[in-house]
């Protein structure tokens, strides 16, 4: 299964961005794939769920994530993220500040999906 794919929850499509357990090279590859999918959708239409569980970040991947979140802003109706812990909280804050997006953090994928389909 691909790292970027549509899943369905309560009959609504959610674009799942699976960065879990990715190293830096895999993060860049997943970002490129996400850009292609998201930016070919109608504006203000995409629900995104991003999983960053055990993802390895560095300065370059952090910058790339900021650019992804900012560039996707016109297309994303709502986004949620799971897997934020430790130092990733600092990266998360940088991404949301840079993009100006409100992307809530959830401890559980199911809760994130429930929230997304209500948006």
Protein language model features and the residues they cover:
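Amphipathic, Lys/Arg-enriched alpha-helical "gate/interface" segment within cytosolic domains
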Residues: 1-119
């Amino acid at each position: 299964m691909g790292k970027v794919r549509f899943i369905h929850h309560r009959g609504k499509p959610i674009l799942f961005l699976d960065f879990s357990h990715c190293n830096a090279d895999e993060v860049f590859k997943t970002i490129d794939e996400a850009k292609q999918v998201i930016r070919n959708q109608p504006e203000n239409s995409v629900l995104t769920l991003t999983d960053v569980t055990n993802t390895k970040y560095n300065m370059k991947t952090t910058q790339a994530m900021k650019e992804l979140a900012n560039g996707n802003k016109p297309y994303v109706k709502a986004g949620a993220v799971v897997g934020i812990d430790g130092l990733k909280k600092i990266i998360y804050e940088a991404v949301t500040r840079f993009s100006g997006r409100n992307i809530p953090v959830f401890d559980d994928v199911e809760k994130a999906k429930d929230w997304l389909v209500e948006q």
